Regions:
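Beta-propeller-forming repeat regions
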Residues: 1-247
């Protein structure tokens, strides 16, 4: 008896003999079937833990639904191997029927300090072509500053997607959870990232701090056809307007 026909999962062979960490699914080639974007290895260093001194890095790999290997890219020393340092998401952001990958990146020249940490240097929001891994667009990630607190609090990064106008997928780049919180909303248009708005919790009256969580949830809460953004105990509407618990 061939029991393989009874399984409710897909099995593919990875390009390297290494365990996968996080996986995103999206249609990379436009055939209507989900493909796989995999971040390896499964290692995870939290900002509150000691840094890694072994020089290990994350790689992003892409596979078609049938297991065909497409490409692999190393994120380099500028991205520490931890989920807070390396958020990524896959979606069709430009409406061409094929998904792109949006993620946090850093220059190849960035180096870690003697504690295995990255405490300075540029950081980017990059968009890669799903079939080739080639970078399509790049802008600055929300920058570090002392208002976030120490490095443990500065290095809390998340990424998401929301239909802010009800029809266009916007990329959301978020920094901060336990003190200052900021969010940038970007649209991929003509192979360029255009910023729609930035929300900065310190610009609210009173200021909004330490209200985040370990995820960012987007959805149409008020049923106006446009997505809102839920960050822990606070919510942003499609224009970046803040709503708190009393609202």
């Amino acid at each position: 008896v061939d029991f393989s026909i009874l399984r409710d999962y897909q099995s593919i062979k990875l390009n390297r003999n290494i365990k996968a960490g996080k996986i995103a699914v999206a249609d990379l080639n436009g055939d209507g079937i989900y493909d796989y974007i995999i971040r390896t290895p499964e290692k995870n260093v939290d900002p509150g833990m000691p840094g890694t001194l072994d020089g290990s890095t994350y790689q992003i790999e892409a596979y078609l639904s049938d297991g065909t290997f497409l490409w692999s890219k190393d994120l380099g020393q500028g991205i520490e191997p931890g989920v807070w340092y390396s958020p990524f998401i896959a979606y069709d952001f430009n409406g061409d029927g094929k998904a792109e990958i949006a993620l946090k990146t850093a220059p190849e020249t960035t180096q870690r300090n003697e504690k295995g940490r990255v405490d300075s240097g540029e950081e980017y929001l990059s968009v890669w072509d799903g079939m080739t891994g080639k970078e399509i667009a790049r802008v600055d990630w929300p920058e570090r500053n002392d208002r976030y607190g120490n490095l443990v609090r500065q290095n809390r990064n998340q990424i998401g997607m929301a239909y802010l106008d009800g029809k266009t997928p916007y990329i959301l780049a978020c920094r901060g959870t336990y003190k200052l919180m900021t969010v940038d909303a970007w649209q991929l248009k003509d192979n360029k990232l255009e910023r729609a708005w930035r929300w900065d919790g310190d610009e609210e009256n009173p200021v909004v701090r330490s209200m985040g969580s370990h995820n960012m949830v987007c959805g149409d809460v008020d049923e106006d056809g446009k997505d809102e953004i839920l960050l822990g105990s606070c919510m942003l509407d499609e224009t970046g307007l803040y709503y708190g618990l009393p609202d």
